[in-house]
Amino acid sequence: MENTIGQQFVEMTKYKNLEKSLQSQGVAWPDLRLPLPEGAEVIDLPAGKALKLDKLDFISLVEQRETIRSYTDESLTLQELAYLLWGTQGVKSILDDKPVTKRTVPSAGSRHAFETYLLINNVEELQPGLYRYLALDHKLVRLPAPQDICGILTEACQNQRHVRNSAVTFFWTAVQVRMTWRYCQRGYRYMYLDAGHVCQNLYLLAEAIGCGVCAIAAYDDDLVNAALDVDGVEQFAIYIATLGKRQK
């Protein structure tokens, strides 16, 4: 039988093939923060839990959830965006004695390797462009980007029109050392699993506010990484999802 790349990945990330972890070697905990661009604009967000929702039936949310690629021209409010960010990466607490966060989504060993980048197209109070969520502070930072960053990222996502037509597109990146520090190469498995947890939360959160989501795995890794200004090795794009208001 052919030894495929996928088969090699599964084999080489088995426990029997792992080296000693950085944690076991006494290497310091990875940083939970990325540096901010010099002079970058930091934007306060409303509290994520402050959004007033109609009384919801959770079973109905789960049952009604579906992938939606067509959105209306209605803007997302800043309060709604804050709610979506809090529900997908929100920090509930930080341990006193170590840099470990408890969040609104599960993560292997509470490692939480992800950063959330946002392509903003149609959100009230925000200029269109590229942003990053500062989860520990519950703020946004606007990132330097070409004027046509929407077109660049749409092309990087194989010209899927719902990227351009979304109110916002979520780009999750993995800072791999946050996970591999403890779990070595097996940590790559966990990062992909964790991405599913985050995106499923987005689907359900969106359903509760009349929005639709389409998760995207079909993208050019190198083009997306370049557009987000990440190196593709230490930090790389791992999952994408478009979001906008549903048709009535």
Kindly give the residue locations of the regions a language model identified:
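N-terminal accessory segments that position/regulate proteins before the catalytic core
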Residues: 1-169, 176-177, 195, 209, ...
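Short acidic/His/Gly/Ser-rich catalytic and metal-binding motifs that mark active-site loops
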Residues: 178-182
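Short pre-catalytic strand/loop immediately N-terminal to key active-site residues, enriched for Gly-Thr
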Residues: 186-194
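C-terminal folded domains that constitute the principal catalytic or ligand-binding module
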Residues: 198-203, 207-208, 212
